[in-house]
């Protein structure tokens, strides 16, 4: 019988199918220590889970790890939920994690510190963003469990201190996996209502695990985004949660939160009484001062002799009117003088004057130009006549009229010496009235003797 050989891929896929169809391996709860932790740029987490005797590769994709409450680190002990599968490329089995939590109180404290540091770096704890708690809130919203001692303490304290105030309770879960989303939704609902002036968010005391909902990042960010001022009241005085740092004001207990949110009506009544007395005293003092002033006025000269005062004022009015008339006349005279000066200036600098002056200047220049052109033409004409006379005196035609002629060779070059021709050469002689074509039949040389 021929043996059947499997490929590595086929074997790996077979093993992967076996594992993935095993119901016990599709929902595995596992605890271990993180090592070789790597956070990929795309958001996926890759690490190893180990205990004293074994280890397993672990993967947590970005879609799942964005909801975890802490930042994983090497050496941290965790509780995870996931499924087992095979990574074909390496042939190794690994756990694909869907949920992860710190294992033990120590790791919860680490997760708490990690979130606190990160939110503080983002500025969520800064005093710059803290809203002022209104001193006389008409309506107080309370976000807490409807059945705990905290709600009883808060309502009792508000009704005792400020019975005219309104209280609206937003019942929520304060511990467990659904607590944080429940608190976040209540904060959003309260912000959609216009009548809420201040919010109390909190619960009674408990362990770190029981208070953990108030350490959730989503709760911290919901408190930070709230338009309504929030007083946090979580646990006892020694309990501090992330919500306390983000809230606009932290109360050590729910009862203290109610005291901070609701003014004491007895103290308010006392303040109103004191201010009423102060106002009455101020009014009495004001009336007394006005009465004294009235008495002074009644004793004054104006009240005792009103006619004389009237006559004085009438005389002052007449003088003022006279001064006004004089001032008006001076003002008019001043403006008339200014107008005359401006008219004289405009007349002096009127464009017609400048046009006339320019026209005279142009006519003068034209006459001067004509004279200079006439003189120049006469000078040039005289020079031309003299030059023509000189040219005529030097003209060969004048010489020819006295019986002389010009002799040219066959190339029409003027012959200046008998040495330039030979016997039999054809020459032409230009006379005054024509040209003779000749042939050299004899040559007789003569010595030059002073031109003779």
Curated annotation (Swiss-Prot):
GO BP, sorted A to Z: DNA catabolic process
UniProt-annotated location(s): Cytoplasm
Substrates-to-products reaction catalysed: Exonucleolytic cleavage in either 5'- to 3'- or 3'- to 5'-direction to yield nucleoside 5'-phosphates
EC primary class: hydrolase
Keyword RNA-binding: no
Name this polypeptide is given: Exodeoxyribonuclease 7 large subunit
GO MF annotation: an example: nucleic acid binding
Function of the protein: Bidirectionally degrades single-stranded DNA into large acid-insoluble oligonucleotides, which are then degraded further into small acid-soluble oligonucleotides.
Superkingdom of the source species: Bacteria
EC number: 3.1.11.6
Matching CDD domains: ExoVII_LU_OBF
InterPro entries: Exonuc_VII_L, Exonuc_VII_lsu_C, OB-fold_nuc-bd_dom
Pfam family, any one: tRNA_anti_2
Keywords recorded for this protein, A-Z: Cytoplasm, Exonuclease, Hydrolase, Nuclease
GO CC, alphabetical: cytoplasm; exodeoxyribonuclease VII complex
Subunit structure: Heterooligomer composed of large and small subunits.
Family (UniProt): Belongs to the XseA family.
Species this chain originates from: Bacillus cereus (strain 03BB102)
Keyword hit for Cytoplasm: yes
């Amino acid at each position: 019988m021929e043996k059947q050989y499997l490929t590595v891929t086929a074997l790996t896929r077979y093993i992967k199918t076996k594992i993935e169809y095993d119901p016990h391996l599709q929902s595995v709860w596992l605890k271990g220590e993180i090592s070789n932790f790597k956070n990929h740029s795309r958001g996926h987490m890759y690490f190893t889970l180990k205990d004293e005797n074994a280890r397993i590769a672990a993967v947590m994709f970005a879609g799942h790890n964005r909801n975890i409450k802490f930042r994983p680190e090497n050496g941290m002990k965790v509780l995870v939920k996931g499924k087992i599968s095979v990574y074909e490329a390496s042939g190794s089995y690994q756990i694909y994690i869907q949920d992860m939590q710190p294992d033990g109180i120590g790791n919860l404290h680490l997760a708490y510190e990690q979130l606190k540091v990160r939110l503080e770096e983002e500025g969520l704890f800064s005093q710059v963003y803290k809203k002022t708690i209104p001193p006389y809130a008409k309506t107080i919203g309370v976000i807490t469990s409807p059945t705990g001692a905290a709600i009883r303490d808060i309502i009792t304290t508000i009704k005792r201190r400020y019975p005219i105030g309104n209280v609206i309770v937003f019942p929520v879960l304060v511990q467990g996996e659904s607590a944080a989303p429940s608190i976040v939704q209540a904060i959003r609902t309260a912000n959609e209502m216009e009548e809420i002036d201040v919010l109390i968010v909190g619960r009674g005391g408990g362990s770190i695990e029981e208070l953990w909902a108030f350490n959730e990042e989503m709760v911290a960010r919901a408190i930070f985004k709230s338009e309504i001022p929030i007083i946090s009241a979580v646990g006892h005085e020694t309990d501090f949660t992330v919500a306390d740092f983000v809230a606009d004001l932290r109360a050590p207990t729910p009862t203290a939160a109610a005291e901070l949110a609701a003014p004491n009506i007895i103290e308010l009544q006392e303040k109103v009484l004191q201010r009423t007395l102060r106002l009455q005293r101020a009014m009495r003092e004001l009336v007394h001062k006005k009465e004294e002033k009235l008495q002074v006025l009644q004793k004054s000269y104006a009240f005792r002799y009103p006619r004389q005062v009237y006559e004085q004022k009438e005389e002052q009015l007449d003088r003022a009117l006279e001064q006004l008339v004089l001032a008006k006349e001076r003002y008019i005279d001043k403006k008339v003088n200014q107008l005359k000066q401006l008219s004289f200036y405009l007349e002096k600098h009127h464009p017609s004057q400048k046009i006339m002056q320019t026209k005279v200047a142009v006519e003068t220049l034209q006459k001067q130009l004509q004279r200079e052109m006439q003189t120049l033409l006469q000078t040039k004409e005289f020079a031309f006549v003299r030059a023509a006379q000189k040219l005529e005196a030097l003209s060969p035609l004048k010489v020819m009229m006295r019986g002389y002629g010009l002799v040219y060779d066959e190339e029409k070059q003027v012959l200046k010496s008998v040495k330039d021709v030979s016997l039999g050469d054809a020459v032409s002689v230009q006379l005054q009235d024509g040209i003779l074509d000749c042939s050299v039949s004899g040559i007789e040389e003569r010595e030059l003797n002073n031109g003779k």
